[in-house]
């Protein structure tokens, strides 16, 4: 089996396993599957769970797509690849819970290959996971980062620190001067050693459930009211802002003629904006700002 097919098989299995775990955690709703084809090449399967007991919407998509010309979002930082044919596969998910005390989360793992005249000229892995709480708890954030640190350990002492820092820098809303959440891991252009890099991608993909599901179980029965729900919807607006303004995956998908429904499944089903909103000083809502700056959660 060639390298691309090995990654592809892992990713389809990962999607299956995460769907099963989320359905078990939700206890009510099930994923609906949408199989799709891309005219330019490839296709995928998008799965959406809606209106569950725990999750308002949970989307997880697998795609395997190809093209004859790299879009600007992909070739901007690799100009030598302009005009190359390409193929990419990945799994991407975003989960939006009902309960404002359960954080929203995102995970993505992907593999990209570019060819010219039948020869592979570049291939790399990318991905990571990050957590976006609305009412954060130190124990949840520390658990999230402990899992991230542990899965990085076999790949060198600096791996966690480097990819945590990359995550903090990537998921940053410059126009708001705040991070999207409390971070996690982010990596891209990892293509020096296929076996080692593929092992790391698997560690990130497999570690996601260990990082997230315990937080869901801990917070899913926390009582909340209209105030918390309104704040959750307001903060979801920042999620939308990041995805539509900064996210490279969203831009790549749209610029490459990708399937808009699948690309935009990351957006929350309900969201609101409020001009000039300022949380009451000393409130739980105001406390969130203390978490939206890069910091060492395990120190």
UniProtKB/Swiss-Prot annotation:
Tell me the residue numbers annotated for binding substrate. Answer: 92, 108-110, 257-259
Q: Which GO terms describe its cellular component?
A: cytoplasm
Q: Where is this chain primarily localised?
A: cytoplasm
InterPro entries associated with the record: Coprogen_oxidase_aer, Coprogen_oxidase_aer_sf, Coprogen_oxidase_CS
This protein's assembly is summarised as: Homodimer.
- Which organism is the protein's source? Xanthomonas euvesicatoria pv. vesicatoria (strain 85-10) (Xanthomonas campestris pv. vesicatoria)
Physiological role? Involved in the heme biosynthesis. Catalyzes the aerobic oxidative decarboxylation of propionate groups of rings A and B of coproporphyrinogen-III to yield the vinyl groups in protoporphyrinogen-IX.
Protein name per its UniProtKB record? Oxygen-dependent coproporphyrinogen-III oxidase
């Amino acid at each position: 089996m060639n390298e691309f097919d090995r990654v592809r098989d892992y990713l389809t299995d990962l999607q299956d396993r995460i769907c099963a775990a989320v359905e078990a955690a939700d206890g009510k709703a099930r994923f609906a599957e949408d199989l799709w084809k891309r005219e330019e090449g490839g296709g995928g399967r998008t799965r959406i769970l809606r209106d569950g007991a725990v999750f308002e919407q949970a989307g997880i998509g697998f795609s395997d797509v190809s093209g004859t010309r790299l879009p600007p979002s992909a070739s901007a930082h690799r100009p030598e690849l302009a005009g190359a044919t390409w193929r990419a596969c990945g799994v991407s998910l975003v989960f939006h819970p009902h309960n404002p005390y359960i954080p929203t989360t995102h995970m993505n793992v992907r593999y990209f290959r570019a060819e010219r005249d039948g020869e592979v000229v570049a291939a790399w892995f990318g991905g990571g996971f990050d957590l976006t709480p609305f009412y954060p708890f130190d124990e949840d954030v520390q658990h999230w980062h402990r899992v991230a640190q542990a899965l990085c350990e076999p790949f060198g002492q600096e791996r966690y620190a480097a990819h945590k820092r990359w995550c903090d820098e990537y998921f940053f809303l410059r126009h708001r001067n705040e991070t999207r959440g409390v971070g996690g891991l982010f990596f891209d252009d990892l293509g020096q050693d296929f076996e080692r890099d593929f092992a790391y991608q698997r560690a990130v993909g497999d570690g996601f459930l260990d990082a997230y599901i315990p937080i869901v179980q801990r917070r899913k029965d926390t009582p909340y009211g209209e105030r918390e729900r309104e704040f959750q919807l307001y903060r979801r607006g920042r999620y939308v802002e990041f995805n539509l303004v900064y996210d490279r995956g969203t831009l790549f998908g749209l610029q490459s003629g990708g399937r808009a429904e699948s690309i935009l499944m990351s957006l929350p089903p309900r969201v609101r904006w409020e001009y000039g909103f300022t949380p009451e000083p000393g409130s739980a809502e105001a406390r969130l700002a203390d978490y939206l700056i890069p910091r060492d959660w395990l120190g």
